Protein backbone atom coordinates (compact mmCIF):
# COMPACT_ATOMS: atom_id res chain seq x y z
CA UNK A 1 0.00 0.00 0.00
CA UNK A 2 1.47 3.36 -0.96
CA UNK A 3 1.07 6.55 0.99
CA UNK A 4 -1.24 8.96 -0.87
CA UNK A 5 0.58 12.00 0.57
CA UNK A 6 4.04 10.98 -0.71
CA UNK A 7 5.59 12.70 -3.69
CA UNK A 8 8.11 11.52 -6.24
CA UNK A 9 11.55 12.93 -5.55
CA UNK A 10 14.87 12.46 -7.31
CA UNK A 11 17.98 12.72 -5.10
CA UNK A 12 20.34 13.56 -7.97
CA UNK A 13 20.41 13.95 -11.73
CA UNK A 14 20.33 10.59 -13.47
CA UNK A 15 18.86 8.79 -10.44
CA UNK A 16 15.43 7.21 -10.21
CA UNK A 17 12.55 9.07 -8.58
CA UNK A 18 11.13 7.50 -5.40
CA UNK A 19 8.03 8.18 -3.34
CA UNK A 20 9.12 9.98 -0.20
CA UNK A 21 8.79 12.74 2.33
CA UNK A 22 11.72 15.01 3.15
CA UNK A 23 13.17 15.04 6.66
CA UNK A 24 15.08 18.16 7.74
CA UNK A 25 17.33 18.55 10.78
CA UNK A 26 19.16 21.48 12.35
CA UNK A 27 22.35 20.66 14.22
CA UNK A 28 24.31 22.93 16.52
CA UNK A 29 28.02 23.10 15.73
CA UNK A 30 29.54 22.95 19.20
CA UNK A 31 28.31 19.51 20.31
CA UNK A 32 26.79 18.01 17.16
CA UNK A 33 23.32 17.56 18.65
CA UNK A 34 20.12 17.86 16.63
CA UNK A 35 18.20 20.89 17.93
CA UNK A 36 15.28 20.95 15.49
CA UNK A 37 13.68 18.72 12.91
CA UNK A 38 10.66 18.53 10.68
CA UNK A 39 9.19 16.50 7.84
CA UNK A 40 7.74 18.11 4.71
CA UNK A 41 6.31 17.04 1.40
CA UNK A 42 8.97 16.57 -1.25
CA UNK A 43 9.10 19.69 -3.43
CA UNK A 44 11.85 21.59 -5.17
CA UNK A 45 11.98 24.24 -2.46
CA UNK A 46 11.14 22.12 0.62
CA UNK A 47 14.70 22.11 2.00
CA UNK A 48 15.06 25.88 1.82
CA UNK A 49 11.60 26.63 3.23
CA UNK A 50 12.08 24.15 6.10
CA UNK A 51 15.46 25.72 6.86
CA UNK A 52 13.93 29.18 7.00
CA UNK A 53 11.08 27.97 9.25
CA UNK A 54 13.37 26.20 11.74
CA UNK A 55 15.91 29.03 11.83
CA UNK A 56 13.24 31.69 12.28
CA UNK A 57 11.99 29.84 15.38
CA UNK A 58 15.57 29.49 16.68
CA UNK A 59 16.32 33.21 16.25
CA UNK A 60 13.04 34.12 17.96
CA UNK A 61 13.92 31.85 20.90
CA UNK A 62 17.51 33.13 21.25
CA UNK A 63 16.76 36.77 20.48
CA UNK A 64 20.07 37.34 18.68
CA UNK A 65 21.75 36.88 15.30
CA UNK A 66 22.91 33.34 14.51
CA UNK A 67 25.00 31.79 11.75
CA UNK A 68 24.07 28.71 9.74
CA UNK A 69 26.20 26.44 7.55
CA UNK A 70 24.41 24.93 4.55
CA UNK A 71 25.42 23.08 1.40
CA UNK A 72 25.41 24.50 -2.11
CA UNK A 73 21.80 23.47 -2.79
CA UNK A 74 20.83 26.39 -0.54
CA UNK A 75 22.86 28.94 -2.53
CA UNK A 76 19.98 30.81 -4.12
CA UNK A 77 19.44 34.56 -4.00
CA UNK A 78 15.95 34.34 -2.48
CA UNK A 79 17.02 31.93 0.28
CA UNK A 80 20.07 33.99 1.26
CA UNK A 81 17.94 37.16 1.26
CA UNK A 82 15.26 35.48 3.40
CA UNK A 83 17.87 34.30 5.92
CA UNK A 84 19.40 37.75 6.22
CA UNK A 85 15.91 39.22 6.71
CA UNK A 86 15.28 36.96 9.74
CA UNK A 87 18.64 37.87 11.35
CA UNK A 88 20.60 34.78 10.24
CA UNK A 89 24.08 34.97 8.70
CA UNK A 90 24.18 32.33 5.94
CA UNK A 91 27.43 30.38 5.65
CA UNK A 92 26.28 28.61 2.50
CA UNK A 93 28.72 26.69 0.29
CA UNK A 94 29.15 28.62 -2.95
CA UNK A 95 27.50 27.06 -5.99
CA UNK A 96 29.62 28.45 -8.80
CA UNK A 97 29.61 25.31 -10.91
CA UNK A 98 29.19 25.28 -14.68
CA UNK A 99 25.67 24.63 -15.98
CA UNK A 100 24.79 22.24 -18.79
CA UNK A 101 24.59 25.31 -21.06
CA UNK A 102 28.25 26.08 -20.28
CA UNK A 103 27.59 29.15 -18.12
CA UNK A 104 29.07 29.65 -14.67
CA UNK A 105 26.51 30.02 -11.88
CA UNK A 106 26.68 33.16 -9.75
CA UNK A 107 26.77 32.51 -6.04
CA UNK A 108 24.53 34.51 -3.73
CA UNK A 109 27.35 34.44 -1.15
CA UNK A 110 30.09 36.99 -1.77
CA UNK A 111 33.56 37.61 -0.38
CA UNK A 112 32.26 39.58 2.60
CA UNK A 113 30.95 36.33 4.07
CA UNK A 114 33.59 33.85 2.91
CA UNK A 115 36.60 35.81 4.19
CA UNK A 116 35.71 35.26 7.87
CA UNK A 117 37.12 32.37 9.87
CA UNK A 118 33.62 31.42 11.04
CA UNK A 119 32.65 30.60 7.46
CA UNK A 120 35.27 27.86 7.17
CA UNK A 121 34.36 26.50 10.61
CA UNK A 122 30.67 26.32 9.63
CA UNK A 123 31.56 24.54 6.41
CA UNK A 124 33.65 21.91 8.20
CA UNK A 125 30.91 21.30 10.81
CA UNK A 126 28.23 21.11 8.10
CA UNK A 127 29.33 17.61 7.06
CA UNK A 128 28.47 16.28 10.52
CA UNK A 129 24.77 16.91 9.89
CA UNK A 130 24.85 13.97 7.50
CA UNK A 131 25.90 11.76 10.43
CA UNK A 132 22.44 12.26 11.93
CA UNK A 133 20.80 10.87 8.81
CA UNK A 134 23.40 8.13 8.42
CA UNK A 135 22.83 6.97 12.00
CA UNK A 136 19.06 7.06 11.53
CA UNK A 137 19.28 4.91 8.41
CA UNK A 138 21.82 2.43 9.74
CA UNK A 139 20.72 2.07 13.37
CA UNK A 140 17.37 3.86 13.57
CA UNK A 141 14.14 3.39 11.64
CA UNK A 142 14.67 5.93 8.87
CA UNK A 143 15.74 3.54 6.10
CA UNK A 144 12.24 2.41 5.21
CA UNK A 145 9.37 3.72 7.29
CA UNK A 146 6.36 1.56 7.97
CA UNK A 147 4.20 4.57 8.76
CA UNK A 148 1.66 6.26 6.48
CA UNK A 149 0.82 9.95 6.56
CA UNK A 150 3.05 12.92 7.17
CA UNK A 151 2.17 13.20 10.88
CA UNK A 152 3.18 9.59 11.66
CA UNK A 153 6.36 9.87 9.60
CA UNK A 154 7.24 13.15 11.37
CA UNK A 155 6.84 11.52 14.80
CA UNK A 156 9.08 8.64 13.70
CA UNK A 157 11.67 11.09 12.31
CA UNK A 158 11.74 13.18 15.50
CA UNK A 159 12.09 10.00 17.58
CA UNK A 160 15.16 9.13 15.53
CA UNK A 161 16.61 12.60 16.19
CA UNK A 162 16.02 12.18 19.93
CA UNK A 163 17.61 8.72 19.88
CA UNK A 164 20.64 10.11 18.01
CA UNK A 165 21.05 12.79 20.68
CA UNK A 166 20.79 10.19 23.47
CA UNK A 167 23.51 8.12 21.81
CA UNK A 168 25.68 11.21 21.31
CA UNK A 169 25.44 12.68 24.84
CA UNK A 170 27.56 10.00 26.64
CA UNK A 171 30.32 10.56 24.09
CA UNK A 172 30.28 14.27 24.92
CA UNK A 173 30.34 13.66 28.68
CA UNK A 174 33.33 11.31 28.32
CA UNK A 175 35.29 13.91 26.33
Cite the ranges covered by each PLM segment.
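Helix-centered, glycine/charged polyanion-binding patches within enzymatic domains
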Residues: 72-155
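Polybasic low-complexity intrinsically disordered regions
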Residues: 1-86, 95, 156-159, 164, ...
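A generic membrane alpha-helix/interface feature
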Residues: 46-49, 54, 89, 105, ...
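A short, flexible helix-boundary coil/loop motif
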Residues: 139, 143, 170-175
Amino acid sequence: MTDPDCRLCRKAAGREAKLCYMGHATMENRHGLAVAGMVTLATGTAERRASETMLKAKVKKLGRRITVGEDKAYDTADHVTNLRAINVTPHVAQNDSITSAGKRRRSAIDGRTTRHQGYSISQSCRAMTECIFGWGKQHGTMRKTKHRGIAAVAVNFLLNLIAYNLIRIPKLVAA
